Amino acid sequence: WSIGEFNPDNLQTSCGMDFGFSIDPDSLTEVAIDKKHKKIYLKEHIYQNGLKSQELAKIVLDKVGQSLIIADSAEPRLIADLKHAGVNIKPVKKGTIESGITRMQDYHLIVSPESTNIAKELNNYIFSDKASKLYVDNYNHAIDGIRYNVIYHLDNPNAGKYFVQ
């Protein structure tokens, strides 16, 4: 991965979101996937603890408007609350952590300079047991949201495209 300008080619973007609350932060990352050049551009918008549903919805709408957000399916009530508040959000079928990370590793990640928490996570995300490919459940909040977005778009190649017949 490297630090660089976010989405210099004006690719279609969407967001990945992981939910937290007291100990873990809510994270929202804007993602642009360049399949041709095998690059994923990342821009951090939210990395904050303790947000209530209404506060989170307001910040999300202020930061990314109606951009599609792919989020952790483990929080259906929060997803429903955010949808009710006007957020364009969909749950993802997560699959394994390993499969999502493997998909991400097929691409060069480019992190915008202001995305310090993403950079910190990428520098510290490690295996707890390399043989079994288990990851330490730490430094993974933005990474999880990014992983949800990448899984959604790479497993649904027509996501976000419209066809006229």
Question: Model-predicted segments: where are they?
Answer:
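Acidic two-metal-ion nuclease catalytic site recognized across multiple nuclease folds
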Residues: 153-165
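ATPase catalytic-site recognition across NTP-hydrolyzing enzymes
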Residues: 1-17
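Short, well-ordered loop/turn elements at secondary-structure boundaries
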Residues: 9-11, 22-25, 63-65, 105
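Stable alpha-helical structural segments in soluble proteins, enriched in small hydrophobic residues
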Residues: 141-153
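Mg2+-dependent endonuclease catalytic cores in nucleic-acid-processing enzymes, primarily RNase H-like
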Residues: 29-135, 162-165
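Oxyanion-binding "anion nests"
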Residues: 15-30, 42
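Structural motif
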Residues: 135-141
